Amino acid sequence: FLPFLATLLSKVL
């Protein structure tokens, strides 16, 4: 998946 999504998830978590 896109690393951008991981960044968004990291902000949420």
Swiss-Prot record:
The keyword Amino-acid biosynthesis does not apply. Keywords: Amidation, Amphibian defense peptide, Antibiotic, Antimicrobial, Secreted. GO terms for cellular component: extracellular region. Its main location: secreted. The modification Leucine amide is found at L13. One of its GO terms (biological process) is defense response to bacterium. It is found in: Secreted. Expressed by the skin glands. Belongs to the frog skin active peptide (FSAP) family. Temporin subfamily. Antibacterial activity against Gram-positive bacterium S.aureus (MIC=100 uM). This is Temporin-1Ce. It comes from Lithobates clamitans.
